[in-house]
């Protein structure tokens, strides 16, 4: 029998509708009541503090590893006397003794008798007495609530009894009440002890978390603290069993010192200056000391802090969890569910907020649960809970939660299942043998064939194993998941000493049994597949469950069992990927999963670099589309980066982060957790070392990409705080004060673009480019766009950017364009008075705008999106715009009826602006087309040399020579930047000459030559890197390194010192890339099998002589 009432506001006089639900029938019952504002707190009567410092007897990271699942529960069935803490010595919070309780009780009786008259007069005293003295409600409740509200709650319980009697209901009486407003909320909830399925306290805690805990970030001035009390007693004298009665109090914090609005790194750490005033008044000295310890730890790490405390002279166990506010959501209710899984109920729970952004939750467990248990067994149980609390911080809830609630799987097992589901969703072979057969028949060099294959691939990937299909299959086989997780645990659990004998999580009856162990038998992949074949009912289910075996078999390391993680990360050997779908083998694959995101990091070489892209979704449909293509997009981006990085030591890599469907407003948090989880796999954690099946250290080199440019400084600082030795080189794109070389400030990407533009002019004997007309996408506000304007001298007739279109056939005013480029402003700031009579500006916000020729522009956005197809000029340099803006469906608009193209020269500065098939069409029409991977490689060259400097300097010298201080640029920094510019121009000219030569001699299309050069360099680079004899020749090796490493760097540090500091893998990459790129640029399309040997012989002689 359920009775529910919600009182919406305290300050309103009204009639409230009471709904009594009996056997699913609704009976209306009127209650008249008035509500008045109540005080947040009043003076508290306190018990003197026993001066005994708290002692942490059992550190959470020293207990033996226990079995990560439980099949039994602890049941709290003993009735607790009401207000049992009032007269005891305390170590947590000073208990409230409400001195006005008796007077208030009399007023409640008077209110019910004379005002309400809903309870028979002769029963009023008995009902009120039972409410005050038998339900175990804390005095805090009576102090916080006014007489009218207490009278309401007593009426609710009485009405429930009447309704139950009228319907002859046999179930136990349950109460569900919530009073909420902006400053205060109080919740009462109950359920029979023996019927946990009726317990709605989880729903209450989810509601509290959603409304009062989760919306507020680290620096928000608003925050709420929570106090919760649990008692066990009979609600009514006629009840046949005890009920758990939960009381929750939520109050708005009144901090001693208001929080700072900016996230300053110098946050205050003294708990007395950042606490809520109520907390300071109520907390004991021991609690303050304890919380200070937890707070200090929270402020020195990114993830949660979990501490276990017990007390001498009193068997109370206290679990304290600290974390940064706003870093996780629904954590409070998730922890409670974890405790209930083990049969634990916290008698008192406190959620405390601090103005420095720290949240601390304290759970108190009473001795009745452990009276027959050995201390080591209790420690083991809570060590287990500690590990799982850290896991819940990463993923408070998953799609497999029903298997946890029904106790078919543990929290670790459902989290494991969730991760494997995501793994399946992205990497399992969904194409089948038919696709492989078709792929073998079609010509991949034919653009039409390649596009057909790609379309079929996307369609099959969507229709085959959907997310729902994979999820439903896993839900059918919890037993298999259980077995597969055991093998995962055996291989990767931390500190189980490689033994298959793991301790079960103890139940109430087995806590005293130290000999209770659980043995896991190791199973081979073949044995697991046999079990899957026998268990699954069809081949599709086998295909899904087989991915668990691949997941386990190819996993090299994971942070799954570390307690300091903030997201889960997995480093795989990617050899399991289907070669039909992924023809070029990856070197490494990392998957990262957090509450707000999922993501991957893929690389094609040991030494590799690429940007980290964060993907947002405008709506659920877009999210589904982005999720389906996530891994393939990551793979293709890394592959493209591999070709673009042909001149530099780092191979191709890329990271992608997909924001969760409901987390589109949390990009920074997702990025931070993604980066931190990857760092877990790269550094050595001495207290909790990973099981490392790779067996060698790894370094990743990253950079900014879509939606992450503003976050790379944080990533660098965070790597430094985590004591990563490679923190200086971890990210490029950082600000100059941190040793970064900004591409936009120095025009690094534009330098290589201009080399190709000017190279074309030089080859065609164009001596005065100012007579050439030019169109540019990507405006003066962007990196490429602004620097292209500054470096060029053609006559601009059109500039198209995010704000709109600027056109003037007489030529745009160059002085005005340079002003916008210097100020990095869009073309909507262009002085329209400087346009000729035929010129115009169309902004995306414009509608029904008339152009000088009489044309009406109905929609400015549509006009902008297609403007690049309207104009004719000598030169077209895309420096921005949407991918595939020119494609096979619209490229014909750039060729007139006589076959004449709109442009003569096209240098693709923006990535992927033109599809490959469209480039082929333009080249056939006579356009000289230079593709993006060749034209814009100046940026990656600059970033690579930034990495090299970071690896070469020690920390002190790096800060002195590579970091700009107070606006003053170090002399070395300025000299190094100038050499970087020269290297960018040298590499661009080498490739341009090779492309021009290959086209002139062999009539091969320019874009095909660009692809050919990149592919050949990458292949030869790989072979040289792995050819030991060349590397073993120390004299030749050092000569190559001396020729390839910037002279400015060598002069400052010395080659010998650099060779000591730079990892050997990176030095080998410098060596192999230098030789491979120069050979291919010289020989272009040579088929002479001895050409490379002749080249090496010549290089050896020349370099050694030098």
Swiss-Prot record:
Enzyme class, spelled out: oxidoreductase
Q: Tell me, which GO biological process terms does this entry list?
A: glutamate catabolic process
Reaction(s) catalysed (UniProt annotation): L-glutamate + NAD(+) + H2O = 2-oxoglutarate + NH4(+) + NADH + H(+)
Q: What Enzyme Commission number does this protein have?
A: 1.4.1.2
Top-level division of the source organism's lineage: Eukaryota
Question: What are the record keywords, sorted?
Answer: Cytoplasm, NAD, Oxidoreductase
**Member of which family?**
Belongs to the Glu/Leu/Phe/Val dehydrogenases family.
Subunit structure, as described in the record: Homotetramer.
Identify this protein by name. Probable NAD-specific glutamate dehydrogenase
Q: Which organism is it from?
A: Schizosaccharomyces pombe (strain 972 / ATCC 24843)
């Amino acid at each position: 029998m359920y009775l529910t009432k919600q009182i919406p506001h305290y300050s309103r006089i009204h009639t409230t509708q009471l709904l009594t639900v009996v056997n699913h029938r609704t009976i209306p019952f009127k209650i008249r009541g008035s509500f008045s504002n109540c005080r947040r707190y009043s003076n508290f009567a306190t018990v003197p503090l026993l001066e005994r410092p708290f002692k942490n007897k059992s550190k959470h990271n020293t207990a033996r590893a226990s079995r990560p699942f439980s099949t039994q529960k602890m049941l709290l069935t003993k009735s607790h006397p009401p207000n049992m803490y009032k007269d005891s010595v305390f170590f947590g919070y000073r208990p409230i003794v409400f001195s006005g309780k008796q007077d208030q009780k009399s007023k409640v009786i008077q209110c019910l008798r004379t005002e309400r008259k809903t309870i028979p007069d002769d029963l009023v005293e008995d009902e009120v007495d039972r409410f005050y003295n038998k339900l175990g409600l804390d005095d805090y409740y009576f102090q916080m609530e006014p007489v009218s509200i207490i009278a309401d709650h007593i009426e609710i319980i009485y009405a429930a009894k009447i309704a139950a009697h009228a319907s002859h209901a046999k179930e136990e009486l349950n109460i569900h009440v919530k009073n909420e407003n902006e400053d205060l909320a109080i919740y009462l909830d109950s359920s029979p002890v023996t019927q946990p399925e009726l317990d709605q306290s989880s729903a209450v805690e989810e509601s509290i978390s959603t409304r009062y805990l989760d919306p507020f970030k680290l620096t928000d001035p608003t925050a709420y603290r929570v106090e919760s009390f649990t008692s066990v007693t009979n609600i009514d004298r006629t009840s046949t069993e005890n009920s758990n009665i939960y009381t929750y109090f939520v109050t708005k914090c009144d901090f001693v010192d208001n929080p700072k609005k900016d996230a300053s790194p110098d946050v205050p750490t003294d708990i007395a200056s950042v606490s809520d005033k109520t907390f300071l008044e109520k907390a004991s000295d021991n609690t303050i000391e304890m919380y200070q310890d937890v707070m200090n730890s929270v402020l020195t790490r990114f993830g949660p802090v979990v501490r276990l405390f017990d007390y001498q002279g009193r068997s109370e166990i206290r679990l304290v969890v600290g974390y940064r506010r706003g870093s996780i959501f629904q954590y409070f209710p998730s922890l409670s569910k974890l405790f209930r899984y083990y049969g634990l109920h916290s008698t008192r729970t406190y959620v405390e907020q601090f103005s420095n952004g720290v949240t601390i939750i304290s759970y108190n467990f009473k001795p009745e649960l452990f009276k027959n248990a050995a201390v080591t067994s209790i420690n083991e149980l809570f060590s287990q809970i500690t590990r799982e609390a850290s896991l819940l911080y990463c993923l408070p809830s998953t799609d497999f939660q029903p298997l946890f609630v029904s106790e078919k799987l543990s929290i670790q097992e459902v989290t494991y299942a969730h991760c494997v589901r995501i793994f399946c969703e992205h990497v399992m072979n969904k194409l089948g043998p038919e696709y492989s057969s078709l792929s073998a028949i079609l010509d991949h060099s034919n653009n039409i064939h390649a596009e057909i294959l790609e379309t079929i691939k996307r369609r099959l990937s969507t229709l085959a194993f959907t997310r729902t299909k994979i999820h439903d299959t896993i839900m059918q086989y919890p037993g298999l998941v259980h077995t597969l997780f055991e093998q995962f645990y055996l291989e990767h659990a931390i500190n189980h000493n490689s033994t298959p004998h793991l301790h079960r999580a103890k139940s109430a009856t087995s806590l005293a049994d130290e000999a209770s162990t659980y043995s896991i038998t190791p199973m081979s992949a073949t044995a697991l597949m046999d079990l899957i074949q026998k268990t699954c009912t069809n081949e599709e289910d086998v295909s899904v469950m087989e991915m668990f075996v691949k997941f386990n078999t190819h996993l090299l390391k994971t942070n799954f069992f570390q307690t300091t993680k903030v997201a889960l990360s997995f480093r795989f050997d990617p050899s399991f990927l289907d070669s039909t779908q992924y023809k070029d083998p990856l070197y490494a694959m990392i998957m990262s999963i957090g509450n707000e995101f999922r993501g991957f990091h893929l690389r094609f070489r040991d030494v590799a670099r690429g940007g980290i892209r964060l993907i947002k979704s405008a709506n659920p449909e877009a999210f589904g589309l982005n999720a389906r293509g996530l891994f393939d997009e990551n793979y293709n981006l890394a592959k493209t980066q591999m070709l673009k990085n042909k001149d530099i030591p780092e191979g191709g890599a890329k990271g992608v982060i997909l924001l969760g469907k409901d987390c589109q407003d949390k990009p920074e948090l997702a990025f931070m957790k993604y980066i931190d989880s990857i760092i877990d796999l790269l550094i050595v954690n001495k207290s909790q070392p990973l099981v490392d099946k790779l067996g060698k250290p790894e370094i990743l080199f990253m950079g900014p990409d879509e939606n992450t440019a503003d976050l790379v400084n944080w990533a660098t600082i965070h790597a430094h705080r985590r004591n990563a030795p490679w923190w200086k080189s971890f990210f490029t794109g950082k600000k100059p004060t941190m040793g970064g070389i900004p591409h936009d400030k120095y025009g690094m990407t534009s330098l290589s673009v201009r080399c190709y533009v000017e190279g074309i002019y030089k080859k065609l004997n164009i001596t005065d480019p100012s007579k050439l007309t030019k169109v540019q996408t990507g405006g003066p506000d962007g990196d490429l766009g602004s620097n292209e304007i500054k470096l060029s001298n053609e006559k601009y007739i059109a500039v198209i950017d995010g704000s709109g279109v600027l056109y003037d056939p007489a030529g745009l005013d160059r002085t005005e364009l340079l002003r916008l480029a210097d100020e990095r402003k869009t073309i909507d700031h262009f002085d329209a008075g400087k346009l000729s009579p035929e010129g115009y500006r169309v902004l995306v916000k414009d509608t029904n705008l008339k152009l000088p020729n009489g044309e009406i522009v109905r929609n400015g956005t549509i006009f902008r999106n297609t403007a690049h197809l309207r104009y004719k000029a000598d030169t077209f340099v895309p420096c921005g715009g949407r991918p595939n803006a020119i494609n096979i469906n619209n490229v014909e608009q750039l060729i007139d009826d006589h076959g004449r193209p709109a442009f003569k020269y096209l240098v693709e500065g923006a990535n992927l602006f033109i599809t490959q098939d469209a480039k082929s069409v333009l080249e056939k029409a006579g356009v000289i087309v230079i593709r993006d991977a060749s034209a814009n490689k100046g940026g990656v060259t600059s970033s690579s040399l930034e990495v090299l400097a970071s690896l070469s300097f020690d920390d002190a010298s790096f800060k002195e020579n590579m970091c700009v201080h107070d606006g003053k640029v170090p002399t070395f920094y300025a000299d190094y930047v100038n050499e970087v510019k020269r290297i960018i121009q040298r590499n661009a000219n080498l490739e341009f000459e090779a492309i021009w030569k290959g086209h002139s001699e062999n009539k091969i299309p320019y874009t095909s030559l660009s692809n050919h050069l990149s592919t050949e360099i990458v292949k030869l680079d790989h072979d040289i890197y792995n050819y030991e004899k060349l590397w073993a020749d120390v004299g030749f090796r050092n000569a190559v390194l001396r020729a390839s490493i910037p002279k400015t760097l060598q002069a400052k540090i010395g080659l010998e010192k650099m060779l000591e500091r730079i990892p050997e893998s990176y030095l080998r990459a410098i060596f192999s890339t230098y030789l491979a790129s120069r050979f291919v640029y010289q020989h272009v399309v040579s088929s002479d099998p001895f050409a490379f040997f002749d080249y090496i012989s010549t290089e050896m002689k020349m370099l050694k002589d030098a």
